[in-house]
Amino acid sequence: MVYICIDTGSHAKGYAVESSDTDYHIYTKCDRETFEKFIDNKELLKNRHAKDESGNDVKYVDLYTGLIGILTGKSPELSMFSKREDFKDKYGIENLQLYEFVTKLMTVSMVKIIYTLMRYKILNNAKGLLQLMFNYVYVEYYLDYKRAPKSTKILNMLFNVGDEIKITMDKNNQLVVNDLNVLDLNKNNGGYKIDETLTLFVKNVKLLKLYVKLMQRGEYQQEWTEYFQQWKQQLQDRLHHVPEPPERTDIRHNIVMYALNERGPVMPEDENKIVYQIYPSVSHLDQGKKGTLADKEIIVQEKLDGCNFRIICNQNKITYGSRNTYRPDGNFMNYYRIRKDLETCMRSLQARFNDGFIVYGELMGWKDDAKTTPINVINYVDQKESLKYYAYEIQLYGGEFVPFVEAQELLTNVGFNTIPCHKYLYNDFVERLNFKSLMFPQSPLEGFIIRCGNLIYKLKSDYKDLNKLKIEKGPFEWLTCDYIKSNCDAIDKSDMMKILIFCYNMCKVKNYNEKLLFNKVFNLFRQQFNLNHNDYKNLYKQYVNMCKCTEYK
């Protein structure tokens, strides 16, 4: 989860007065399911306006909307007013990868952003002109230096300094630097020596004087509008020489993939780096998906309520990352407590894969050795260790995963803790579903992870209608692999027609359920005999001909 709170109002822009409130934008990231629904219902991620307890204006924005706003230049506040320390995850830990992505995204979109800043009308009041002054100063800064300013405050931009230099206007309507030095605006050369280490320069003293006048919020003067009209024309003339940037559909694609939790926030030029590979988002099992699992063997693991954590081996270096964020330097959840053991296991795996692979797993336990603050909602009182890592997948450079069963064996052999796996027929699993943990009997069970071939789903304990996941029993429900093999000599896929003939005769099939029987038998032996789509087509063709032949009726 992402939580970013930034000030986008007069305080951030440097023209606030004592009575000014604060204008906040709060960005959060919706879950995958909400974003999927947003594709058909744009109202789901619509901005929401409110007031906080202090009466400040608050706009709630989904992160996807904020990122697209930067890309298009139409609502770039997230990139313009945020600082590195503003980017946090739900644990309050710095999200450096997202900050770097937003910074790069802003660089790509700067021309579109400054065109947006130029579109506002010239208003006939001091406050409106100060708002416009911010826009024009920002645009002029970019045209002069070809980069974003170090600060978003008007005076700091004019003097080309960052927020470490404090420039304010006192009660006597004088500009003061660092609360000590008063600037003499009648000194027209634009240079102001503050001390032996700091001299400030400004190219337009007249603009400084206009700022002071506007900050007094006095009676409107026509000459102000005339100044802004002339200034606007000068900027537009300069912008005529700045070409429109090309559309970046590749970046838009990556933003969408990030919203779907299929990728972290990464620019296209970086997406093939192994440190930015993340574990694919897992969909919820629901009624609409049960048909793909009916009559098939599934592998089930308990879903642990920890923190998704990846260990990356790349160029003989081991680094770490959370769900969507690469964390080469951050001490996520104080994982240093088990870091030595993790790296020992990774080095053992490196002997098998050489270099360029990722181990995905779950950090479980507490943020501290005293066990005072659980990592997540569920408190696993059965766990003796203050922090433990359960590994569950291995991904190679390029995105390919090691087959799941093979990966479990490899992870266990090198010393990783793994989550026990159990095999069931899907129909039996949902019929006897029980949300009780075998790993942690004294703690609630968050749910299950269910795998079938390349399919993977999660089933949480709060699923509303479990009965809808069950498979209605058909006329051939009693057929099992064990029954067939004990009554029919079957060794491999070459015996499939023999099996089909046996089942056809045993079940006394009618015309309307011939295909139902075929699908039932095919799925029973699909994994065991390694049957594929071509096998299905060839066998079904023979089966249809067999059904037409009276000698089998």
From Swiss-Prot:
Q: What is its main location?
A: host cell
UniProt keywords, alphabetically: Early protein, Host cytoplasm
Keyword Disulfide bond found: no
Record's keyword annotation contains DNA repair = no
Question: One Pfam family from the UniProt entry?
Answer: RNA_ligase
Subcellular location, in the record's words?
Host cytoplasm
Q: What does this protein do?
A: May participate in the recruitment of G-actin to the host nucleus.
Entry protein name:
Protein Early 65 kDa
This protein's species is Autographa californica nuclear polyhedrosis virus (AcMNPV)
